[in-house]
């Protein structure tokens, strides 16, 4: 049974406007025409986003592999979030770029369904791995002993990936290679019922954006309260320890030292919380316009159909995949410092090993110079008595 055609949008949810990015027209009148100037700008921006996403996340994975603290829980979540961002770059940004260049999907039906499926897998994975990282930081602040005792991070990450793979299955049934005009085929979304686009876009918006943002807001609200409560208690404890040091001497100084050490540990945790909070903030800023435009386009029949608004929202959403590496660099700069040091060390070792002839010649020249200097000094020492 043929359903209602929606649209062949370049990324996973672009079902509502009726036109692909950079195109104008409607579905019933045949294939749309493209705004070439707008498409060229989009291709240039997507090339930059793809390069930054691939290079940035690859550097993060390489830095995490070479660091001495690779078994840290935070680094474990960072690794999988970088993998999810790479999935977004390869299976969302890259197909979008190719689709903008060719304007049509040139490939078999299986490839069409696979690409659309992996697009949503990356989006689900990046969202829920970020949510998992935030929950881990919440446990580390609110219940530190429990978070150390129950090391279920690997199981949680595995369950998250499996859940994302399952939740993305509808894409395989919605998208297929369809004839959109006489002799013109494209990777197209088809719904059995007219209300299908509304239901599907609303479900994706709830699952990927609204529900995670609510949970993230609750997590960081609780984290903020616990940090404020902790700092308040430490301020009171520090004041009491300072008074005790005046009265009890050494015992008071020991108590003050204990308070100072606890404050250092708390600052380390707060720093990781700040990092995850900035990542969450970047996620909200990048994805809010996209989901707003999507919901507006499917629920309001009078919504504007211009492609420029959808392209800006899509580009901003794609930008999220290359933001996270810079945030990691800002808060964990030692990772990249170690990576640069290892790179320079390996480069110097390679250059030193690739020029053995120059090395041996320099060694010989140094040794001959040393012998000549020894001989000249001995000659001077032997000639001194005779001159005297």
From Swiss-Prot:
The modification Phosphoserine is found at residues 365, 367. The chain crosses the membrane at residues 39-63, 75-97, 114-135, 155-175, 203-225, 275-293, 309-331. GO terms for cellular component: plasma membrane. Pfam families: 7tm_1. It is found in: Cell membrane. The keyword Membrane applies. Residues 64-74, 136-154, 226-274, 332-388 are cytoplasmic. Residues 354-388 are annotated as: Disordered. Residues 365-388 have a biased composition (Low complexity). PROSITE patterns: G_PROTEIN_RECEP_F1_1, G_PROTEIN_RECEP_F1_2. Receptor for oxytocin. The activity of this receptor is mediated by G proteins which activate a phosphatidylinositol-calcium second messenger system. Belongs to the G-protein coupled receptor 1 family. Vasopressin/oxytocin receptor subfamily. This is Oxytocin receptor. It comes from Mus musculus. The gene is Oxtr.
């Amino acid at each position: 049974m043929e359903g209602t055609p929606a649209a062949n949008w370049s990324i996973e949810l672009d079902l509502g406007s009726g036109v692909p990015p950079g195109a104008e027209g409607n579905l019933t009148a045949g294939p749309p025409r493209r705004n070439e100037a707008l498409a060229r700008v989009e291709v240039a921006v997507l090339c930059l986003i793809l390069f930054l996403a691939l290079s940035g996340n690859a550097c993060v994975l390489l830095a995490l592999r070479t660091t001495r603290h690779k078994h840290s829980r935070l680094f474990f979540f960072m690794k999988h979030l970088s993998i999810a961002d790479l999935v977004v770059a390869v299976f969302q940004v890259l197909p979008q770029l190719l689709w903008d260049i060719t304007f049509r999907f040139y490939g078999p039906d299986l490839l069409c369904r696979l690409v659309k499926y992996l697009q949503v897998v990356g989006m689900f994975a990046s969202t829920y791995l970020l949510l998992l990282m935030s929950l881990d930081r919440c446990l580390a602040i609110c219940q530190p002993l429990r978070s150390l005792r129950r090391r279920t991070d690997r199981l949680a990450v595995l369950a998250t990936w499996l859940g994302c793979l399952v939740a993305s299955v509808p894409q395989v049934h919605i998208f297929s290679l369809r004839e959109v005009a006489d002799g013109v085929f494209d990777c197209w979304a088809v719904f059995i019922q007219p209300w299908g686009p509304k239901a599907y876009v609303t479900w994706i918006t709830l699952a990927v954006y609204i529900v995670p943002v609510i949970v993230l807001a609750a997590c960081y609200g609780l984290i903020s309260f616990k940090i404020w409560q902790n700092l308040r208690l430490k301020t009171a404890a520090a004041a009491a320890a300072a008074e005790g040091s005046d009265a009890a001497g050494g015992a008071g100084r020991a108590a003050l030292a204990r308070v100072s050490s606890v404050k250092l540990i708390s600052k380390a945790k707060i720093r990781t919380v700040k990092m995850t909070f900035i990542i969450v903030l970047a996620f909200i800023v990048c994805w809010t316009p996209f989901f707003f435009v999507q919901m507006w386009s499917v629920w309001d029949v009078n919504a504007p159909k211009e492609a420029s608004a959808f392209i800006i929202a899509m580009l901003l959403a794609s930008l999220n995949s290359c933001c996270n590496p810079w945030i990691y660099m800002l808060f964990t700069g030692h990772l990249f410092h170690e990576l640069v040091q290892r790179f320079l060390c390996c480069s110097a070792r390679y250059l030193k090993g690739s020029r053995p002839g120059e090395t041996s010649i320099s060694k010989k020249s140094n040794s001959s110079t040393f012998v000549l200097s020894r001989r000249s000094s001995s000659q001077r020492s032997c000639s001194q008595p005779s001159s005297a």
